[in-house]
Amino acid sequence: MTDRIRLNEGNRRWWTLAAMCFALFMIMLDNTVVNVALPSIQRDLGASLSGLEWTVNVYTLTFAVLLVTGGRLGDILGRRRMFLFGVVVFALSSAAIGFAPGQGWLVAGRAIQGIGAAFMMPATLSIITVTFPPEERGKAIGTWAGEIGRASCRERV
């Protein structure tokens, strides 16, 4: 019975890692994937050049500015709570971006998406750190970090 429980805990750890890696993949992919859509955004929304620049940069700006705050709030309020909050903000803003009627809405949605990412990313690493025992932690964090490279390659396709 004890071995079976340990097996289930092991499976749960790897499913947790998969979820955290997926979240990180989405965060990193959204960092630059919008570059591919810039001609369509300009054509369909009538975006100006400065609007296109803001569309690209506002996500990174809000993400970078709030990343440490997201980590600290995760320490204070709980990593799981901050992760779920970040997922909700990220998902809702992604939907809003998809239905953006104009350039201003698109930029605002990308800013809010960056906020969601800033709350999610530190929580992903923190959750992995507490989920895995020390002897498996390096492999788990290496897998997590590999998602950054995978997302960077994927965004150009």
Where would I find each of the regions flagged by the language model?
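Transmembrane-helix bundle of Major Facilitator Superfamily
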Residues: 2-156
